[in-house]
Amino acid sequence: MKIFKEIPTQKPITPILDGINLPSDIRSLSLGELESLANEIREFLLYSVGQSGGHLGGGLGVIELTIILHYIFNTPFDNLVWDVGHQAYPHKILTGRKNKMQTIRKKGGLAPFPSRKESEFDAFGVGHSSTSISAMLGMAIATKESNPEKKHIAVIGDGAMTAGMAFEALSHTGHLKPNVLIILNDNDMSISENVGGLSNYFSRIWASKTYKGIKKSGASFLKPLPQAYHLA
């Protein structure tokens, strides 16, 4: 992964990205080319959003994930729903909008979030957070009979998972068992600290002497098993 110490002020050279206009174009790339594409998108995103303004962190954190989702799934036939709209900048770049990325937040320019009016690849008009699983579930139920082979994917972050709407949708999804995939982007990041009874309850558990003792004992027990010990 290429490391950037500052926002590029000149348009980067992106030979692979220049040839990508739709997700179908990336499905013929080799693994090495996909890795190079990720680096090119990263630099291009820094440059373009650096010109227009916007939220970089969410998009920068899902570049490889965005590439692989569009590589594996047949978008836009398969529905891809992004939970926090700022994560969708790489998605916009790969779905025919890279030449307009500098217009984000400008009059007549691209929306800062996915918009169904903007592209057929935007399956849902995303707001800020916690709506993706509900939206994906509704799509899956609606197409269960007419398009049973259609797949539905939601990408949600650990911060968005603290909302009640996400928990309710998870519960309903587990009951109905539709043809869906939920990806948890657990990056330990959120705009503000978690609040609420559930968060406080688990915080007390994780900070308790009992929990710490159990964790320490479990880690010692698993030490002969390197892979399990790492998880502990």
Predicted regions and their residues:
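Gly-rich Lys/Arg/Thr-decorated short loops/hinges at beta-loop-alpha junctions or inter-strand turns
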Residues: 15-22, 43-48, 111-123, 221-232
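Cofactor-binding active-site loop characterized by glycine-rich and histidine/acidic residues
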Residues: 55-176
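Long, well-ordered, tryptophan-enriched scaffold segments
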Residues: 2-11, 188-232
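A short alpha/beta connector and helix-capping loop motif
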Residues: 163-187, 195, 201-207
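Hydrophobic alpha-helical scaffolding
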Residues: 27, 55-58, 128, 159-163, ...
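Generic secondary-structure signature for well-ordered alpha-helical cores
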Residues: 39-50, 74, 106-109, 141-144, ...
